[in-house]
Amino acid sequence: MVKVGVNGFGRIGRLVTRAAFTSGKVEVVAINDPFIDLNYMVYMFQYDSTHGKFKGTVKAENGKLVINGKAITIFQERDPANIKWGDAGAEYVVESTGVFTTMEKAGAHLKGGAKRVIISAPSADAPMFVMGVNQDKYDNSLKIVSNASCTTNCLAPLAKVIHDNFGIVEGLMTTVHAITATQKTVDGPSGKLWRDGRGAAQNIIPASTGAAKAVGKVIPELNGKLTGMAFRVPTPNVSVVDLTCRLEKPAKYEDIKKVVKQASEGPLKGILGYTEDQVVSCDFNSDSHSSTFDAGAGIALNDNFVKLISWYDNEFGYSNRVVDLMAYMASKE
């Protein structure tokens, strides 16, 4: 089992660690976070307002974080080049600070003995992989990769199924997205993106997202055919993608449902879900799928123009894919 270090113990860092323990697919051996001391790590890992209390045991012992009896080395370095991942036995590093997202910056982890780095965010220059879509393009020569964004992980599997079966001529995506840490609790300054600085709990905030364009990077045939935007809404977690697209081959909505259901039970099992239930966002909290197609919510204007709806837990679903990508990479060593 591959040994993993986590850099940045925020929402994704903590949930990747949870996903590692619940899935048993990778082993977390080290965590670096200069802003959180050990006792605070215990508290933050144990208690989670969104996903509930951790079901195992967590304690601090001999300067280490001990989860379910497993001792994890703690570092508190600001500069990633100074983290001694090798000494802790970490082979792969999850870069989840949201700060070191380029090849050059994330590459600093390699100096401390890490063999590979997985960026838990979109990257300007690192190759992006979406499980269920293009992981087969991964090869051993790649030291630094990106797991793309939570929204790309929701959209890409659905877009792949639709494109493979009916062909997507062009499409627009909207994600109705839960609040994340980059937003403000009350109105405040926000650099160039003025709207993003408005109170997160009070507003529906139009925002930009590169998630749809990024699908073109993981499915090259869709490059230039998709773009999208986001509405940030006052919910703590779980988001939903609306993909409105023009189809090459005419299809009845029932045909679309059928192929998505087949994919969800076959090649994309565990990644793409399918439901005909009358669900709402809450129902997907702590769901580990990348994307769950809502058969009852979509609509068709005609056989070539459809609106498709898919839900995702933008925290936990994504964190599980980070773990899956690492397990997949380890299988290719």
Curated annotation (Swiss-Prot):
Annotated binding of D-glyceraldehyde 3-phosphate, by residue: 149-151, 180, 209-210, 232
Glycyl lysine isopeptide (Lys-Gly) (interchain with G-Cter in SUMO2) crosslink site(s): 184
Modified residues (Deamidated asparagine): 7, 62, 68, 147, 153, 223, 314
Residue list for modification Cysteine persulfide: 150
EC number: 1.2.1.12, 2.6.99.-
Residues with S-(2-succinyl)cysteine modification: 150, 245
Catalysed transformations (reactions): D-glyceraldehyde 3-phosphate + phosphate + NAD(+) = (2R)-3-phospho-glyceroyl phosphate + NADH + H(+); S-nitroso-L-cysteinyl-[GAPDH] + L-cysteinyl-[protein] = L-cysteinyl-[GAPDH] + S-nitroso-L-cysteinyl-[protein]
MF-aspect GO terms: glyceraldehyde-3-phosphate dehydrogenase (NAD+) (phosphorylating) activity; microtubule binding; NAD binding; NADP binding; peptidyl-cysteine S-nitrosylase activity
Residues with PTM N6,N6-dimethyllysine: 3, 64, 192, 213, 225, 258, 261, 332
Keyword Magnesium attached: no
Binding-site residues for NAD(+), renumbered to this chain: 11-12, 33, 78, 120, 314
Modified residues (N6-malonyllysine): 192, 213
Signal sequence coordinates: none
Keyword Phosphoprotein (UniProt): yes
Any single GO CC term annotated in Swiss-Prot or TrEMBL for this entry: cytosol
Family membership: Belongs to the glyceraldehyde-3-phosphate dehydrogenase family.
Functional summary from the UniProt entry: Has both glyceraldehyde-3-phosphate dehydrogenase and nitrosylase activities, thereby playing a role in glycolysis and nuclear functions, respectively. Glyceraldehyde-3-phosphate dehydrogenase is a key enzyme in glycolysis that catalyzes the first step of the pathway by converting D-glyceraldehyde 3-phosphate (G3P) into 3-phospho-D-glyceroyl phosphate. Modulates the organization and assembly of the cytoskeleton. Facilitates the CHP1-dependent microtubule and membrane associations through its ability to stimulate the binding of CHP1 to microtubules.
Oligomer status and interactors: Homotetramer. Interacts with TPPP; the interaction is direct. Interacts (when S-nitrosylated) with SIAH1; leading to nuclear translocation. Interacts with RILPL1/GOSPEL, leading to prevent the interaction between GAPDH and SIAH1 and prevent nuclear translocation. Interacts with CHP1; the interaction increases the binding of CHP1 with microtubules. Associates with microtubules. Interacts with EIF1AD, USP25, PRKCI and WARS1. Interacts with phosphorylated RPL13A; inhibited by oxidatively-modified low-densitity lipoprotein (LDL(ox)). Component of the GAIT complex.
Family matches, as PANTHER family: GLYCERALDEHYDE 3-PHOSPHATE DEHYDROGENASE (PTHR10836), GLYCERALDEHYDE-3-PHOSPHATE DEHYDROGENASE (PTHR10836:SF111)
Protein name: Glyceraldehyde-3-phosphate dehydrogenase
Species this protein is from: Cricetulus griseus (Chinese hamster)
